[in-house]
Swiss-Prot record:
Identification of the protein by name: Cysteine--tRNA ligase
Gene Ontology cellular component list: cytosol
PANTHER family hit by this protein: CYSTEINE--TRNA LIGASE, CYTOPLASMIC, CYSTEINYL-TRNA SYNTHETASE
Organism listed in the record: Psychrobacter sp. (strain PRwf-1)
Family matches, as Pfam families: DALR_2 (PF09190), tRNA-synt_1e (PF01406)
Gene: cysS
Length: 505
């Protein structure tokens, strides 16, 4: 695996630009269905809650998208100068967890511990920072019981004859406001199984009565365990208060989970629950949402056996977080080619400057006048609802400029400009936590991986471009190495006045 190079300190001019751009941030709010200027509830501070994983299996690529998306949101908010409290829960008691533990003949605690550990390993491999808090459902039963008691006292909840406690959706006037569904319309088209213990078919469980052989906790309603929805309401309130700035999760959680969270929390506290709702789009396979229930999912670990973790991160960031994305090997290979372009530019700069661009000592001398518009364009993209594909296009433009400067760096002035732009490229890429590995080691490792399978046209073109750059920088050994690799892979090159052409033999 490629070893990390020394990560650059953010250039002073970029830090100043970022701090000046707090007010320009706009976020699409699923509640209002508008992109609007972001204003934190408390100046300089942001509370963000994201629904995490139910830990009964390995995380799949859909989970990876949520992890990476909100990792970048958190990073960007911090770069803007905010103090962020990022909370992501863990559901460690649930019907699926109980069923899997029984299927395996494994204690529930051992099962959840194993998959929490695996989740953390996967997130770290994808370059995600740990949340500031990661509350587990089983550690906050008291808070859940308190909230259920408050809801019952305010006549939003009732105990049924079977020992369950339900939320009465009829008692909350705003039910459906997030998903834009009216309760009467839901009832009119309902195919919900009739449950004689419920007053309304859409009432949902807050507390499940104990069943033989299942974990249970004592309560005033008898032994049992919490429902899924109350977990997030109680834990978010515990960690962030009655109201907080951002609530996030996958688009599939908008209804009923997030709708039910709103009903519970706002009925219990009388406060607006979350002031901005962010939802990450689906990852599709052959036009269908990737999910465990459909059996069409790929675990992060399976995909990492074929692709570098940073390639997966780049694939996720190459699409806007709200869009739907189609998952395929071809899409991952295209992401690999794009990431390679950035590393090739950094490697070309290293070869000319004979030092890692991340450790440049003249960072403090860089100023906005010499840096061009790249940083401003990058900031504008990220402030536009975290538009990472547009931000990546800025990185591509900057990489192209770095390559050109590396080819023409015959004098001190050009070399100084090359160092400036290369440092800027790594610093901007670092905000997304890409491009921070040692370029030469990353590219060498990728050549070995590419050689194991037939190369795509994009991979061939990327290697040809690296060969041309290597020749221009008088790194003939590297150019010959790439030529030999392509020949051994059945790719014949022909150099001419108009450039290099190729064909498969």
């Amino acid at each position: 695996m490629s070893s990390p190079a020394k990560i650059a300190q953010t250039p002073e001019f970029l830090s100043k630009q970022l701090l000046q751009q707090q007010a320009a941030l706009k976020i699409y709010d699923s509640m209002t269905t508008n992109k609007r200027s972001f204003e934190p509830l408390q100046a300089g501070k942001i509370g963000m809650y994201v629904c995490g994983m139910t830990v009964y299996d390995y995380c799949h690529i859909g989970h990876a998208r949520v992890m990476v998306a909100f990792d970048v949101v958190s990073r960007w908010l911090r770069h803007l100068g905010y103090e962020v409290n990022y909370v992501r829960n863990i559901t460690d008691i649930d019907d699926k967890i109980i069923a899997r533990a029984n299927e395996n003949g494994e204690p529930i605690g051992e099962l959840t511990h194993r998959f929490i550990k695996a989740m953390h390993e996967d997130a770290a491999a994808l370059g995600c920072e740990n949340p500031d808090a990661e509350p587990r459902a089983t550690e906050h039963i008291d808070e859940m019981l308190d909230m259920i008691g408050t809801l019952e006292q305010k006549q939003h909840a009732y105990a049924a004859s079977n020992g369950d406690v339900y939320y009465a959706v009829d008692t909350f006037e705003g039910y459906g406001k997030l998903s834009k569904r009216k309760l009467e319309d839901l009832q009119a088209g309902s195919r919900v199984d009739v449950d004689t213990d419920k007053k309304n078919p859409f009432d949902f469980v807050l507390w499940k009565a104990a069943k033989a052989g299942e974990p249970q906790w004592a309560s005033s309603w008898g032994g049992g365990r919490p429902g899924w929805h109350i977990e997030c309401s109680a834990m978010s309130t515990k960690c962030l208060g009655n109201s907080f700035d951002i609530h996030g999760g996958g688009h599939d959680l908008q209804f009923p989970h997030h709708e039910n969270e709103i009903a519970q929390s706002e009925a219990a506290t009388g406060c607006t629950y979350a002031h901005n709702w962010m939802h990450v789009g689906f990852i599709n396979v052959d036009g269908e949402k990737m999910s465990k229930s459909l059996g069409n999912f790929f675990t992060i670990r399976e995909v990492m056996q074929k692709f570098h973790p940073e390639t997966i991160r780049f694939f996720i960031l190459s699409s806007h977080y709200r869009s739907q994305v189609n998952f395929s090997d071809a899409a991952l290979k295209e992401a690999h080619s794009g990431l390679t372009r950035i590393y090739q530019a950094l490697k070309a700069a290293d070869a000319v400057l004979n030092t890692s661009v991340s450790a440049a000592e003249s960072i403090e001398s860089i100023n906005a006048e010499h840096a061009g518009t790249h940083s401003a364009d990058f900031i504008a993209a990220m402030n536009d609802d975290f538009n990472t594909p547009q931000a990546i296009s800025v990185l591509f433009s900057l990489a192209k400029e770095v390559n050109k400067l590396a080819r023409d760096a015959d004098d001190a002035d050009t070399q100084a400009q090359l160092q400036l732009q290369a440092v800027q490229l790594r610093a901007l890429a670092g905000i997304l936590n890409i491009g921070q590995l040692n370029p030469a080691e990353f590219l060498q490792a990728q050549i070995g991986e590419v050689a194991e399978d037939q190369m795509s046209d994009e991979q061939i073109e990327a290697l040809i471009q690296e060969r041309l750059d290597s020749k221009a920088n008088k790194n003939f050994a590297r150019a010959d190495e790439i030529r030999d690799l392509l020949q051994n892979s059945g790719i014949e090159l022909e150099d001419g006045k108009l450039g290099t052409t190729w064909r498969r033999t």
